[in-house]
Amino acid sequence: MLKDYALKILKKSLEYDVGFGDITTNSIIPEGVKAKGVIKAKEKCIVCGIDFIVAFFEEYGIKCKKLFNDGEEAYGNILEFEGDARTILMLERTALNLLMHLSGIATMTNRIVKKAKSVNKNVRVACTRKTLPLLSPLQKYAVYIGGGDTHRFRLDDCVLIKDNHIAIVGVKEAIRRAKENVSFTKKIEVEVSNLKELREALEERADIIMLDNFKPEEIEEALKIIDEFERKTNFKPIIEVSGGIKEDNILEYAKYNVDVISMGALTHSVKSVDMSLDIVRYQ
């Protein structure tokens, strides 16, 4: 299903890229020329999206041989292919753009997850919905391949009460309304921006509490309040921290006894992996 979705995205992207035709290739390369080539990772990476690219190439008659699977660390050749030279050159940039981007997300996620778990083996590193339009399912798949958590995919996955909901009805009323109107099968998460809102979320027994934009020292104070509430009531929610968290400061947050660290940077600030498509033989 995800492969089918990726193929639709790739074909639509190709349609835009080609326009009325690849005038460079068509003016230089004669019809009927066959070529063989490789896609090469020019830096170590976690491969992601290779099956999407194989499906894309094969849709246009290009035969492929995978050298690595999604989730594997790679360097050098990751895919071999052969077929019509004009077609290969037409597909090149569209294929590379997606493969480089998804592999970049998987690689960055993998690196950050390892850092976080070095100080807190139980913590989950999750992405957010700060994704590119139409690419969100693929970007979240890349986070998963890198060892991260996808968080909610869509608005119908769980209740997530954010600052603008709170601005209208307040923390307590928002949680009460969600419990009244949403199926018991859906967890209720609330984003809190200060200790007052935290206490209100605890009192209403939110399933998940997100400490949003809390500084490390504020997280420590919040956890004391949560622990005290647990001692009194035997209730403890899942604790998520989010806001301003990047690779260079992840350890400042992971050292605390939190369950989830969510990072928009996993999808909105990722560096693509350096890759190339090289023709190695033609006839």
Curated annotation (Swiss-Prot):
Pathway: Cofactor biosynthesis; NAD(+) biosynthesis; nicotinate D-ribonucleotide from quinolinate: step 1/1
Keywords: Glycosyltransferase, Pyridine nucleotide biosynthesis, Transferase
Keyword Nucleotide-binding in record: no
Transmembrane parts of this sequence: none
Record field: catalytic activity: nicotinate beta-D-ribonucleotide + CO2 + diphosphate = quinolinate + 5-phospho-alpha-D-ribose 1-diphosphate + 2 H(+)
E.C. code: 2.4.2.19
GO molecular function per UniProt: nicotinate-nucleotide diphosphorylase (carboxylating) activity
Xref: CDD domains: QPRTase
Positions with a binding annotation for substrate: R93, T128, R129, K130, R152, K162, E191, D212, S242, G243, G244, M263, G264, A265
InterPro entries xrefs: Aldolase_TIM, NadC, NadC/ModD, Nicotinate_pribotase-like_C, Quinolinate_PRibosylTase_N_sf, Quinolinate_PRibosylTrfase_C, Quinolinate_PRibosylTrfase_N
Enzyme class per UniProt: transferase
Coiled coil: none
GO terms classed as biological process: NAD biosynthetic process; quinolinate catabolic process
GO annotation, cellular component aspect: cytoplasm
Database matches in PANTHER family: NICOTINATE-NUCLEOTIDE PYROPHOSPHORYLASE [CARBOXYLATING] (PTHR32179:SF3)
Functional description taken from the UniProt entry: Involved in the catabolism of quinolinic acid (QA).
Quaternary structure and partners: Hexamer formed by 3 homodimers.
NCBIfam families xref list: nadC
Record family assignment: Belongs to the NadC/ModD family.
Official protein name in the record: Probable nicotinate-nucleotide pyrophosphorylase [carboxylating]
Organism: Methanocaldococcus jannaschii (strain ATCC 43067 / DSM 2661 / JAL-1 / JCM 10045 / NBRC 100440)
Gene coding for it: nadC
